[in-house]
């Protein structure tokens, strides 16, 4: 019973966070030609926790490592960390996805 209660409360929290964050990132994804379903990567990466930080040092909703964040245009230093800025980090994520699409040739799996 305790596991069900935990799962229910976590699900409710994710729904609340999705209602807060998805309306911000959906237009950014669309403007950059990124499939709307990619927003769910944020759920997997950070549980939609804007202050998430992994033991390895990845941070923010999209869980960028410092060097990767800088590579895709985010300012990351001792004074500023734009990995926590939802709009800027989402634009950086779009750049990351576009680079991956260029390397792979498509967002779709083609055996």
Language-model segment annotations:
Residues 34-51, 108-111:
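Short, functionally critical alpha-helical segments immediately adjacent to catalytic or ligand/cofactor-binding
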Residues 16, 23, 27, 39, ...:
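Solvent-exposed, polar/charged alpha-helical surfaces in well-ordered, non-transmembrane soluble domains
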Residues 1-33:
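An acidic, Gly/Ser/Thr/Pro-rich helix-cap/linker signature
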